[in-house]
């Protein structure tokens, strides 16, 4: 279950980034994180920190809740 949550969260981050036509490289620079970190997030290999989520939501101009759409915890 935990891995599924990370995967879905990463997928949502990637979808929102692509909607804004921002490359991973540009996104990493904009949120002051490494390209490797962004890649791992989008693959569901790591979980974002609260600070990273905050930065991503500001850069993408969306509410943080958008990253959690479609994630079900049972």
Regions found by a protein language model. Give the residues of each.
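A short, Lys/Arg-rich alpha-helix, primarily the initiator
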Residues: 1-19
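Residues within the helices of the helix-turn-helix
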Residues: 14, 25, 54
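DNA major-groove recognition helix of helix-turn-helix/homeodomain DNA-binding modules
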Residues: 51-66
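Short, charged recognition helix plus adjacent turn
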Residues: 2-4, 66-74
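Short alpha-helical DNA-recognition segment
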Residues: 21-40
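Alpha-helical residues within the helix-turn-helix
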Residues: 18, 29, 58
């Amino acid at each position: 279950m935990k891995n599924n949550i990370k995967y879905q969260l990463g997928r949502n981050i990637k979808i929102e980034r692509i909607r804004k036509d921002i490359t991973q490289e540009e996104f990493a620079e904009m949120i002051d994180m490494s390209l490797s970190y962004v890649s791992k997030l989008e693959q569901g290999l790591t979980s974002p920190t609260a600070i990273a989520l905050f930065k991503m939501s500001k850069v993408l101009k969306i509410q943080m809740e958008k990253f959690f759409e479609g994630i079900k915890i049972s």
